[in-house]
Amino acid sequence: MSKRLYYEEPYLQKFKGKILEKIKIGGKPALILDNTCFYPTSGGQPNDLGYIQGVSIVDVIEDNEKIIHVLKEGIEEECGDMVIGKIDWERRFDHMQQHSGQHILSAAFEKLWNADTVSFNLGDEICTLDIMKDNITSEEVKKAEILSNNIVLENKPIKVYFVDQEKANELNLRKIPPQKGDIRIVEIKDFDICACCGTHCGTTGEVGLIKILKWEKRGVKIRLDFICGKRSLKDYYWKNELIKNISNKLTIKDTELGEVVERMLEERKETRKELREIKEKLQEYEAKRLIDESSIRDNGIRIINKLFEEKNFQEVRGLVQEIINLDDSVVVLAGIKSKGEVEGAKILFACSRALKYDMNRLIREAGKFIEGRGGGAPNFAQAGGKKAEGIEDALNFALEHFQEFIKK
């Protein structure tokens, strides 16, 4: 059995321990000590990190009454049975802030909205809290956050102690764990009391700012993302810097940012609408120009055979669609070799719906010249391949096909 020093003194950073067992976990050396400061992963809280005899701890595992310390490498034999352990205090105190903050937040939601906590996870950057509530409003979240931070400001003592099962049943606990033996209680004076095995701050004031970042509905639950203490300060730093920089670039007050962004988004929406209308007019103009410049065959059919190098595929596709919509006796054979696109080749064959040519069949035959594949409808088909230098051969093949077809 390993004595858990963090139960008695969560602020203890360095300790001496006696090696009880040396084992292997996942091929890595591991130690079981008679006592330890290292908290194992449990109850939604990750394990502590740190060093034993200067060797890095990579994991801390709870195995019944034993605490297993998994090491990056073996320790020197010269140390004998006694070793010195030192925890990563920054990580430990961060976990204390987050876990105590969760207790405050859970109690706030329970008191205000009768929303029980279902689960809690202490992540590396964000903590999550799942509460039983069908829906939640911004105002409800705000009230819970305000209450939580008021409890922080009151600097209430956080008391940790053990009770037996009989005493636990008498306490107004949110949930009684099914474990046998004594139960560890974490109590925030005149605010919350619950069973918990984690490490906690000595007072609510040490938790620091509690900030709910976002929330979302998960079935019959609500999941809240939140941070506490130094994490909140870090979050405030980058957000404040971002707001300051954007405000300076726009030469406005930071309090005007929301209003200005709304106006800019509306202006962008209008600009995009105007740009779309201009592009549509230009597309129609270009389509008419290509139709007018194309030669008329003996049977009245126009053939437009063109390689596009300054347009992307979507632009050419829209233009070709415009052409066959404007003229009921036109055939378009288009190749696309655009700048800035992924290397390769694309061809697009189309004809007016009134014409009964099989563009799908033709595109499959011409696609061989670009080492590609494709298909589509009888009047509109496309293909893509990896041989860009074969585009002109594909277009010439298709043009010869139509010239021979028309002669017949």
Spans of model-derived segments:
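Conserved nucleotide-binding/hydrolysis modules and their immediate coupling elements
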Residues: 1-81
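A generic structural motif
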Residues: 29-31, 65-74, 127-132, 348-349, ...
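Active/ligand-binding-proximal structured segments within catalytic/core domains
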Residues: 36-52, 78-129, 379
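Divalent metal-coordination and catalytic microenvironments
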Residues: 43, 103-105, 129, 198, ...
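Functional cores that coordinate and move charged inorganic groups
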Residues: 91, 111-221
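Glycine-rich, acidic loop segments that terminate in or are immediately followed by a histidine
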Residues: 195-207, 304-408
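A conserved active-site cap/scaffold subdomain adjacent to cofactor or substrate pockets
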Residues: 201, 205, 213-262
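Hydrophobic helix-and-loop "lid/oligomerization" segment in the mid-to-C-terminal part
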Residues: 241-343
